[in-house]
Design a protein with these regions (language model features):
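N-terminal hydrophobic or amphipathic helices and topogenic motifs
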Residues: 1-66, 81, 98-100, 104-108, ...
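Bilobed "Venus flytrap"/periplasmic-binding protein-like clamshell domains
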Residues: 31-59, 110-111, 115-174
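Extracytoplasmic
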Residues: 31-33, 62, 75, 82-85, ...
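Beta->alpha turn/N-cap motifs
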Residues: 69-73, 81-95, 165, 181-188, ...
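Hydrophobic/proline-rich hinge and linker segments of small-molecule sensing/allosteric domains
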Residues: 102-122, 211, 257
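Short helix-loop capping/hinge motifs at secondary-structure junctions, enriched
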Residues: 118-125, 216, 261-264
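Pocket-lining segment of extracytoplasmic ligand-binding domains
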Residues: 142, 156-250
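Secondary-structure end/capping motifs
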Residues: 224, 228-296
Length: 376
C-alpha cells in the first residue's frame, strides 16, 4: 500500500473519531426534555408547572419540561399510561397505574361541600336522593362522589358544573342542584371568597358548609383520602368562611413520573422543584405547598428511585460519578499512545537508517575485536 493511501486511511479514521466524539459530546450536553401532562390550563397546577418549566430553562437545568395540555388529572394519568407524557399531575383518588411513581406531593386540599341554608342538609347523609353539583375538571371528582355516596348510603344524581360563578349561581337559584361539591387548594382562599360572594349575590340564597362527620372512618377505609378540617376563616370573607371549623376529608395531588425515566433525571427535577419553590411562588402561590412524597411502601404512589435519592441526600458528587474515568483515563491514554506508534509505523516512519547502520558497524567491530583476542 502506498504512503498516500496510508495517509488517506489514517485521516479518514481520525475524522470519523472526531465526528463520533463531537456527536457524543453534543448528545450528552443537551438537556433532558420530559413531557408533563397537566390541566386544565386555567387551574393552579398548570400555572405552577408552567412557572417551573420557565425556571428550569432560566437556570440552565439539565432537565426541561414540555407541557402536554390535559382536561384534568384523570386525563393526565391516561396520557401517562398511553405513553403520551412522561410525567403527570394526578390526584390520589385516581385510577392509579403501575407505571406511575411519585416525584413530589404538590398539595393536599380539603373537600368542600355546601348547601343552601334551611334545607335540612347538615351532613352528607342528608343528600340521599338529591342532586350534587360537582365543580371541577371532567372526571376529577367522580371517584370522590362515588366513595361518599357508598359510605353514607346516600344514592342520588350528580350534575357537572363549570367553575364559573354564573353557572354555579344559576344551578343554585333554579334548584337544579341541592348541594355543591368541589376540591380547592388553600391558596385559593381569597378567590373562593370572591366566588362565594358572587354566587350568594346572584342566587340570592345563603350557603352553609356540610360536614363529613365520619371522616376518620372514611379515610381509614379509603387510603386515597385523609381526615382533616376546614379551619374557621380559612377562605376569608366577612363574615369568615367558614364561621367555625368543619370536619371533612382531604385529597392529595401528586407529580408522578413513568417508572422507566432515569433516576438522574428525576433527581435533578426534584432538586429544582424544592430549591426554586420560593422563587416560583410569586407567580404561582400554590408552589409553597409542595412536600416530599411518602416513602412508605403502602403509599398511594410508590416513590420514584430518583426522588428517593434526592430525599435521602444520596446524590453522588462529581468525583464519585467520574472516579472510574479518572482511574482508567491514564491507562486509556497509554493505549492510545501505543496505537499512535503503530499508526506511525504503518505510515512508513522508521528509525533513522544511518543510526541503524552505525549500530550494525559497531557490532561488527566488536565481533572482529573478539576474534582477534581469541587468536592471540
Amino acid at each position: 500500500m502506498s504512503r498516500v493511501l496510508r495517509w488517506a486511511l489514517v485521516v479518514c479514521c481520525v475524522c470519523a473519531a472526531i465526528a463520533l466524539g463531537a456527536a457524543a459530546w453534543y448528545r450528552l450536553s443537551q438537556p433532558i426534555v420530559l413531557t408533563v401532562a397537566v390541566g386544565p390550563a386555567d387551574f393552579d397546577d398548570a400555572a405552577r408547572i408552567s412557572a417551573f418549566a420557565r425556571k428550569l430553562v432560566a437556570g440552565g437545568s439539565p432537565v426541561r419540561l414540555s407541557i402536554v395540555p390535559s382536561s384534568g388529572p384523570t386525563d393526565a394519568l391516561d396520557r401517562l399510561k398511553k405513553g403520551e407524557a412522561q410525567l403527570a399531575v394526578v390526584r390520589s383518588d385516581g385510577s392509579g397505574s403501575e407505571q406511575a411513581q411519585a416525584v413530589a406531593l404538590l398539595h393536599t386540599d380539603p373537600v368542600v361541600i355546601v348547601a343552601p341554608e334551611k334545607t335540612g342538609i347538615e351532613s352528607f347523609g342528608d343528600l340521599k336522593g338529591k342532586t350534587i353539583g360537582v365543580v371541577g375538571p371532567p372526571g376529577a371528582n367522580d371517584s370522590l362522589v362515588r366513595t361518599l355516596r357508598q359510605h353514607y348510603r346516600a344514592p342520588g344524581e350528580t350534575k357537572m358544573l363549570a367553575a364559573t360563578p354564573f353557572e354555579v349561581s344559576t344551578a343554585v337559584r333554579t334548584r337544579a342542584v341541592d348541594a355543591l361539591l368541589f376540591v380547592v387548594p388553600t391558596t385559593r382562599g381569597v378567590k373562593l371568597g370572591e366566588s362565594w360572594a358572587a354566587v350568594r349575590s346572584a342566587s340570592r340564597r345563603k350557603l352553609a358548609f356540610v360536614s363529613l362527620d365520619e371522616a376518620e372512618a372514611l379515610a381509614a377505609a379509603n387510603p386515597a383520602y385523609e381526615a382533616g378540617e376546614i379551619e374557621a376563616g380559612q377562605f376569608g370573607g366577612s363574615p369568615s368562611l367558614p364561621e367555625e371549623s368543619v370536619t371533612t376529608i382531604q385529597v392529595a395531588t401528586y407529580l408522578v413520573a413513568n417508572r422507566n425515566i432515569s433516576a438522574d433525571a428525576i433527581t435533578a427535577l426534584a432538586r429544582t422543584l424544592f430549591q426554586e419553590r420560593q422563587a416560583v411562588s410569586g407567580e404561582a402561590p400554590i408552589a409553597n405547598l409542595i412536600k416530599a412524597a411518602s416513602t412508605e411502601k403502602d403509599a398511594v404512589y410508590p416513590l420514584h428511585p430518583g426522588a428517593k435519592v434526592y430525599y435521602a441526600g444520596e446524590e453522588t458528587s462529581l468525583m464519585e460519578r467520574y472516579g472510574d474515568w479518572l482511574f482508567y483515563g491514564p491507562m486509556l491514554l497509554g493505549a492510545l499512545g501505543s496505537g499512535l506508534l503503530v499508526v506511525l509505523r504503518f505510515l512508513g516512519f522508521r528509525e533513522d537508517r544511518d543510526q541503524t547502520a552505525l549500530l550494525a558497524r559497531i557490532r561488527e567491530v566488536d565481533l572482529l575485536d573478539q576474534r582477534s583476542s581469541d587468536a592471540c
